[in-house]
């Protein structure tokens, strides 16, 4: 039953209009979706937000993209799922708890309620019955359950490894979470620490993960993903074909045992340069480094300094390359020559074998290291017979196709592929190496030394204590029937470590195997675990018996995923892995979670600041400054309103609270209404590109909606009384119908290709066409008006649903065709596009002199006759006799006199 609507006001009042629309949709439970096999399904989802408590216009843009897609596809007959939830675990809640002395659970749930209250006025068609918060026990129970399944399959395992340690957030960071050597949340310089933790064997899936982003012939290739994202994942997975081999040695520890069994292994993709090795470098944690440091205090001190830094390739690529000699030597595997071993701060223990061969003549990093420390440089590859030059050393490394080995004994004179094969064969013959494929991708460490996350379901049993004959059971998985391991929600972190370690109620437990006193694991899971499968839980959020059920089979894989490019490597790669692991555990039947991916652009805004004597910047809100513009409208200066003194133009930047250039949706909605906020964020530019916020642009969108309201209410009686018969329509009505259906065809095309900025401009052109049509007061012309306005309202509805809904009700469309929620997308009337009259450009001696209207069926002779009879020709020919008439069909007529 339709909710009553108030009689429309003569003025556009978005507050009342939008409140009435919300009441109507709520009464109908309009956005609840159920599985329906009689219709094609479409699952469109935005990446779930972290509940920071504040919605910004970037959120509005992202969710409006999703909403426009969902509403349009529903009109096209699809059963569309558009859910929303909350990525609710994580460090910000703990940091806020420390600052505000409030439990993270309370802070998080308060923020969820606040953000939800900010979303609802936007009219987003989320199915809130499927809402998920990852901090709810009925969600993270399944994180724990699946972790135990992965443990059973050997995909989850425990090991001790050198990791990235964030000293501020006091937790381990995955390599992907270290940005320019700093923690992605805290911004603090990371350190290296050796620490035990749980890992997920994502590398077991490296081949499949790579194939679906790198090989178009792969059955699961992600054709619907942006090439940029596929390339980012391909690079991160980083498949490398090369040779793994060992440098033998006689280095022994204090007990006389060979360190590392007398072999120091390395991997190289350039085995053709093996005879150019003049040194080797090992990681600070390598057994040879540890052995040498035991008797060398200076080396030991250097190794300690190396720990003050992260373990990511990106960080090591940019930091200064430093090293210390160990005094140790290994043997070259082919020549037998002694090779000095150095400790290098740029070598990672977690990558390969923690050692690299140094070939200064043919590697940029090795060259810089050798020049710095006076190590020999030996050319072993040349191009076109040229010899090594310090000015052109890069050429010998980069040009694999033309390079030929030299100074390499019996391996000289070989091309790159032949040399690699020969070196691999020679090493294999000695049992020292062979060809191997390696990966840049590393297993995913999920242990975090933080409180606000999913508890890892492990119990540590050490037995019954001193004197007991019970040796303990070690690490024992929590029995499935005891899940979930509940996270206590009343703890308040104080910044001194994980509060779970101090909670006796959580920590102390009986061993499930032997009953002896034991302790729970206090590490929690990386929050990327939570976001790796939430989109499947949306499909069946009330499932108590299973992680996912048959409803997941109906909706998944997702048809369209929407989110920022910043998630290309972290979230999107983990989600792909998680899906494949679920498949291999028999939980899902598909290989990839997201058929199509859309990466929206950022919303930008002007920024303004003033620097104090110490160089610290104070950022001003746009409302706090007056800006001066040049004659082209470009900002050239600004002053603070508070004191009239200059402030600096920071330029157009991403909206950021730290720079005070965030535009609050609440402010825009209060001033202009939600439809204006939605409309401008779409009109500002292509959705996949960044766009700048503009107050004047928002005002322009508001003026358009006000014009639409004024025009539609003025035409109310004519539209309500109109029929659908276009017989005897006037020329103006015929032209209007053609314009309307041409625009409808274009708008439909733009919806299909997600070009929502041109959808909005198409809606604006539709209103222009309706306003400018000089229609007669006849039944046929009123029918053309009714049709055109109805098409406009449906075209605009996904972008500005409130005003479209109100006018649809008021103008009588709902009474005749049902609720706009259920209205089908309008079809293009091909007959309306057929022209019975066309307009040609009229030229005289090649100069534009007017326009010529002729029947669309007119042949060349009829067009010539019309041109010769036109008053424009008589005016500009000035009595001269036409010599020639040139007709360009469908475009122009040129009369030569």
From Swiss-Prot:
Matching InterPro entries? aa-tRNA-synth_I_CS (IPR001412), aa-tRNA-synth_Ia (IPR002300), Leu-tRNA-ligase (IPR002302), Leu_tRNA-synth_edit (IPR025709), M/V/L/I-tRNA-synth_anticd-bd (IPR013155), Methionyl/Leucyl_tRNA_Synth (IPR015413), Rossmann-like_a/b/a_fold (IPR014729), tRNAsynth_Ia_anticodon-bd (IPR009080)
Q: What Pfam families does the record tag this protein with?
A: Anticodon_1, tRNA-synt_1, tRNA-synt_1_2, tRNA-synt_1g
Quote the cellular component terms of the Gene Ontology held in the record.
Answer: cytosol
| This protein's UniProt keywords | Aminoacyl-tRNA synthetase, ATP-binding, Cytoplasm, Ligase, Nucleotide-binding, Protein biosynthesis
- Main localization is cytoplasm
Enzymatic reactions: tRNA(Leu) + L-leucine + ATP = L-leucyl-tRNA(Leu) + AMP + diphosphate
Q: What is the name of the protein in this document?
A: Leucine--tRNA ligase
């Amino acid at each position: 039953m339709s909710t009553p609507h108030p009689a429309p006001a003569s003025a556009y009042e978005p507050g009342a209009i939008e409140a009435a629309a919300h009441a109507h949709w709520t009464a109908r439970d309009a956005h609840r979706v159920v599985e329906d096999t009689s219709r094609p399904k479409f699952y469109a989802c935005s990446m779930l937000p972290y509940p920071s408590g504040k919605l910004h216009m970037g959120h509005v843009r992202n969710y409006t993209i999703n909403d426009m897609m969902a509403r349009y596809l529903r009109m096209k007959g699809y059963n569309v799922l558009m859910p929303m939830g909350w990525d609710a675990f994580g460090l910000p809640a703990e940091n806020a708890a420390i600052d505000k002395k409030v439990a993270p659970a309370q802070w998080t749930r308060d923020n969820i309620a606040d953000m939800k209250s900010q979303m609802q006025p936007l009219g987003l068609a989320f199915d809130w019955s499927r809402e998920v918060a990852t901090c709810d026990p009925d969600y993270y129970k399944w994180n724990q359950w699946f972790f135990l399944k992965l443990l059973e399959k050997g995909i989850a395992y425990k090991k001790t490894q050198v990791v990235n340690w964030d000293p501020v957030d006091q937790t381990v960071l995955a390599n992907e979470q270290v940005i320019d050597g700093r923690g992605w949340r805290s911004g603090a310089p990371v350190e290296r620490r050796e620490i035990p933790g749980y890992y997920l064997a994502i590398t077991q899936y490296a081949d499949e993960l790579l194939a679906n982003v790198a090989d178009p012939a792969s059955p699961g290739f992600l054709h619907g993903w942006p090439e940029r994202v596929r390339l980012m994942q391909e690079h991160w997975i980083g498949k490398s074909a090369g040779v793994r081999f060992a440098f033998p040695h006689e280095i022994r520890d204090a007990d006389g045992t060979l360190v590392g069994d007398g072999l120091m292994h390395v991997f190289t993709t350039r085995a053709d340069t093996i005879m150019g090795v003049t040194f080797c470098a090992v990681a600070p944690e390598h057994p040879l480094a540890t052995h040498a440091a035991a008797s060398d205090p200076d080396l030991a001190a250097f190794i300690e300094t190396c720990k003050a830094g992260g373990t990511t390739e990106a960080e090591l690529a940019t930091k200064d390359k430093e090293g210390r000699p160990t005094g140790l030597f290994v043997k070259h595997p082919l020549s037998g020559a002694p090779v000095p071993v150095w400790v290098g701060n740029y070598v990672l223990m977690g990558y390969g074998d923690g050692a690299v061969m140094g070939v200064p003549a043919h590697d940029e990093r090795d060259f810089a290291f050798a020049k710095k420390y006076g190590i020999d440089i030996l050319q072993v590859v040349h191009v076109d017979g040229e010899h090594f030059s310090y000015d052109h050393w890069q050429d010998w490394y980069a040009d694999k196709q033309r390079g030929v080995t030299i100074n390499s004994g019996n391996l000289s004179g070989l091309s790159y592929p032949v040399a690699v094969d020969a070196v691999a064969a020679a090493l294999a013959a000695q049992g020292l190496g062979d060809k191997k494929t390696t990966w840049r991708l590393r297993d995913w460490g999920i242990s975090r030394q933080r409180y606000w996350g999913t508890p890892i379901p492990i119990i540590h049993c050490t037995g019954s204590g001193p004197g007991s004959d019970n040796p303990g059971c070690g690490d024992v998985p929590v029995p499935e029937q005891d899940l979930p391991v509940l996270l206590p929600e009343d703890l308040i972190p104080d910044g001194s470590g994980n509060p779970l370690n101090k909670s006796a109620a959580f920590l102390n437990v009986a061993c499930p195997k032997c009953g002896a006193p034991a302790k729970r694991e206090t590490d929690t899971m990386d929050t990327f675990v939570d976001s790796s499968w939430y989109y499947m839980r949306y499909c069946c959020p009330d499932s108590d018996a299973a992680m996912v059920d048959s409803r997941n089979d109906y909706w998944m894989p997702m048809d369209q995923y929407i989110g920022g490019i910043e998630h290309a490597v972290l979230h999107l790669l983990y989600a792909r892995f998680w899906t494949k692991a679920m498949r291999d555990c028999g939980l899902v039947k598909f290989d990839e979670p997201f058929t199509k991916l859309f990466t929206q652009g950022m919303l930008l805004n002007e920024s303004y600041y003033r620097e104090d004597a110490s160089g610290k910047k104070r950022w001003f809100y746009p409302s706090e400054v007056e800006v001066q513009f040049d004659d082209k409208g470009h900002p050239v200066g600004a002053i603070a309103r508070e004191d009239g003194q200059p402030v600096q133009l920071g330029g157009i930047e991403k909206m950021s609270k730290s720079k005070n250039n965030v535009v609050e949706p609440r402010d825009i909605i209060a001033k202009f209404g939600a439809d204006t906020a939605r409309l401008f964020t779409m009109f500002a530019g292509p959705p996949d590109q960044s766009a700048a916020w503009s107050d004047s642009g928002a005002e322009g969108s508001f003026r358009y909606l006000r014009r639409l309201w004024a025009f539609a209410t003025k035409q109310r009686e004519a539209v309500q009384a109109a029929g659908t018969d276009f017989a005897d329509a006037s020329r103006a009505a015929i032209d209007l119908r053609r314009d309307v259906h041409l625009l409808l065809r274009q708008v439909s095309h733009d919806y299909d290709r997600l070009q929502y900025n041109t959808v909005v401009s198409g809606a604006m052109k539709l209103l222009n066409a309706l306003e400018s049509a000089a229609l007669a007061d006849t039944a046929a012309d009123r029918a053309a008006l009714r049709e055109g306005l109805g098409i406009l309202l449906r075209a605009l509805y996904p972008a500005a649903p409130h005003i479209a809904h109100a006018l649809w009700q008021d103008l009588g469309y709902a009474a005749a065709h049902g609720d706009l929620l259920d209205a089908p997308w309008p079809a293009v009337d091909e007959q309306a596009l057929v022209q019975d009259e066309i307009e040609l450009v009229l030229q005289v001696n090649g100069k534009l002199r007017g326009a010529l209207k002729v029947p669309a069926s007119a042949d060349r002779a009829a067009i010539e006759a019309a041109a010769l009879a036109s008053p424009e020709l008589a005016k500009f020919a000035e009595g001269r006799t036409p010599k020639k008439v040139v007709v360009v069909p469908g475009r122009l007529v040129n009369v030569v006199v």
